[in-house]
Design a protein with these regions (language model features):
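Conserved N-terminal catalytic/coupling substructures associated with nucleotide/phosphate chemistry
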Residues: 1-192
Length: 192
């Protein structure tokens, strides 16, 4: 009887912690979203689903990778997917539908595979925290990116499909390419 009572009290205690924690996360996240984009926060409506074309667009995945690199090359930050530039909560359903099983696990796996292939498994493991909080009863994805220990270069495609390596940093509320003539100076100042 005593064991059951202790178990019941422990479960109630733990469930209260979870509720409080979820409420705090929800409140903090809503505040973050209402503040809008800045040097430490970027919103993306989707990871790969093009809302204008109503289909998968691999260029959007490049933009996600560019944003992750820009945060890493600067002071770190938070990428929020499922929220548009006007702070509207869109959710992840459009992206989920583009994946075989349409789950958040598959979404995270796809995201991590993109990052692994672009920047290496060690970076993806040590520098990213991927979460799927609910805001206004809608699941979104937050990616916390730590300030990087070494520079990240992003492979981007031009209009003709030609790929090249570019260096991006966070500047204000956008990811900016640093001109090739300035990269060495920035890298020397930032990473050494």
């Amino acid at each position: 009887a005593r064991r059951n009572l202790l178990a019941k009290e422990l479960n109630e205690f733990l469930s209260n912690i979870t509720v409080t924690s979820d409420e705090n996360v929800d409140t903090d996240l809503i505040g973050l979203i209402k503040e809008g984009e800045n040097s430490g926060v970027e919103f993306k409506t989707t990871m790969r689903y093009d809302m204008r074309e109503n289909k998968v667009n691999k260029k959007l995945e490049e933009v996600i990778l560019k944003t992750i690199a820009a945060f890493s090359n600067a002071e770190g930050g938070t990428l929020v997917m499922g929220v548009d530039d006007d702070q509207n909560i869109i959710g992840l359903e459009n992206d989920y539908r583009t994946l075989k099983n349409g789950t958040k696990d598959e979404f995270e796996l796809h995201l991590r595979n993109l990052v692994n292939n672009a920047y290496g498994v060690q970076f993806a493991t040590n520098s990213l925290t991927v979460l799927f909080p609910e805001v206004e009863d809608t699941e979104i994805c937050t990616v916390e990116i730590k300030q990087g220990l070494k520079p990240l270069y992003s492979e981007v495609s031009d209009k003709n499909g030609n790929k090249s390596k570019k260096f991006y940093v966070r500047s204000g509320n956008s990811s900016q390419e640093i001109d090739i003539t300035e990269v060495a100076s920035y890298v020397n100042q930032r990473f050494e």
